[in-house]
Regions:
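Short acidic alpha-helical/loop segments enriched in Asp/Glu that coordinate divalent cations
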Residues: 229-238
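C-terminal, active-site-flanking charged/polar segments
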Residues: 212-225, 229-230, 293-298, 302
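Membrane-proximal N-terminal segments immediately preceding the first transmembrane helix
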Residues: 1-7
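Membrane-embedded catalytic scaffold of the fatty acid hydroxylase/desaturase
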Residues: 46-170, 237-326
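C-terminal regulatory/interaction regions
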Residues: 299, 329-334
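Alpha-helical bilayer-embedded segments of polytopic membrane proteins, i.e.
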Residues: 11-53, 80-85, 138-153, 172-224
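Juxtamembrane transmembrane-helix termini
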Residues: 161-168, 198-201, 230
């Protein structure tokens, strides 16, 4: 295979060492600003660090650097559980299915946002037409953007729940690795709460907590929602399920690349390439992009790439389409 022959599946230890040191330096700089009483800039910088750590746990959990999966797992516990507060195993539990069945209704857990949002019309069937939830659905395209900053808080809570249940998980692997994840999360909250403790008063602590987590949440969410929510969803019975490449290309939208975007988005602006080659390291996605474009053109497949505002508007339109259906259903009983 050409991508393997050109070494595009090989991760660079120097690249990942630099990225880890870069995020640790960002955290230390946030500590320093806090020490100098620049509390708001410190909180914002912590949010940036947590976003960047999100890309690193994503990459190590995809086994992009080491050939030995055990070393990738250890790295994911460090950048994920300890530094970030996210469960490595919990991430794999949902994300691996997302890759195998991207935007497939009833399989891709990323589509399951009920009761707050309906990503497909089928979700409306689960609620009565006079339910208050249907009112939320009617206006979901309006309040969607306001919920993006809360993504990190949601993932933190999900991580705590998942890790607490790991010792009794039905997968033997999770039972064996539960202690690593539990220690990692415990240490994360130890240093994270200690950081808040050294702030001068409760009002500053509350400000710091919410600013750092909401900034980190928005920086994560504006990326991870762009790629798939703006495109079509498919039924499990669809013929596209028999062609992995078609499924990934037709359910994914890229963000236009650039130096700043490549850094800010952690390489996920090359989401089509990432979905076709999940274990390909971030620093090679730009190189493989022309090959993927050529493959799409030769096979009559769309290669969707847009600027952020175009993609975000298409994302909003997808939610509005479902909102319109919800509005019609509720009007029938008005």
């Amino acid at each position: 295979m050409k991508v393997r022959a050109e070494g595009l599946m090989n991760g660079s230890p120097l690249f990942y060492a630099r990225k880890i040191l870069e995020t640790i330096f960002t955290i230390l700089l946030a500590f320093y600003l806090q020490y100098q009483t620049y509390y708001l800039p410190s909180a914002i910088l912590m949010g940036v660090a947590w976003q960047q750590l999100g890309w690193l746990i994503h990459e190590f959990a995809h086994h992009q650097l080491f050939k030995n999966r055990y070393y990738n797992d250890l790295a994911s516990y460090f950048v994920g559980n300890f530094l970030q507060g996210f469960s490595s195993g919990g991430w794999k539990e949902q994300h691996n299915v997302h890759h195998a069945a991207t935007n497939v209704v009833g399989r891709d857990g990323d589509l399951d946002l009920v009761p707050f949002y309906a990503t497909v019309a089928e979700h409306l069937n689960n609620y009565s037409q006079d339910s208050w939830i249907m009112i939320l659905f009617r206006w979901q395209h309006v309040h969607w953007a306001f919920m993006l900053p809360f993504l990190r808080l949601s993932w933190l809570l999900q991580s705590i729940i998942f890790v607490s249940q790991m010792p009794t998980h039905y997968y033997d692997y999770y039972r064996k690795t539960a202690i690593y994840e539990q220690v990692g999360l415990t240490l994360h909250w130890t240093w994270s709460l200690a950081q808040l403790y050294f702030l001068p008063d409760w009002s500053t602590r509350i400000m710091f907590f919410f600013v750092s987590h909401l900034v980190g949440g928005f920086l994560l969410a504006h990326v991870v929602t762009f790629n798939h929510y703006s495109v079509e969803k498919f039924a499990l019975s669809s013929n596209i399920m028999s062609n992995y490449a078609c499924l990934q290309i037709m359910t994914t939208r890229n963000m236009r690349p650039g130096r700043l975007i490549d850094w800010l988005w952690g390489g996920l602006n090359y989401q089509i390439e990432h979905h076709l080659f999940p274990t390909m390291p971030r620093h090679n996605l730009n190189t493989v992009m022309p090959l993927v474009k050529q493959f799409a053109a030769e096979n009559g497949l769309p290669y969707m790439v847009d600027d952020y505002f175009t993609g975000f508007w298409l994302e909003i339109q997808q939610f509005r389409n479902i909102a319109d259906v919800a509005a019609k259903l509720t009007k029938k009983i008005a």
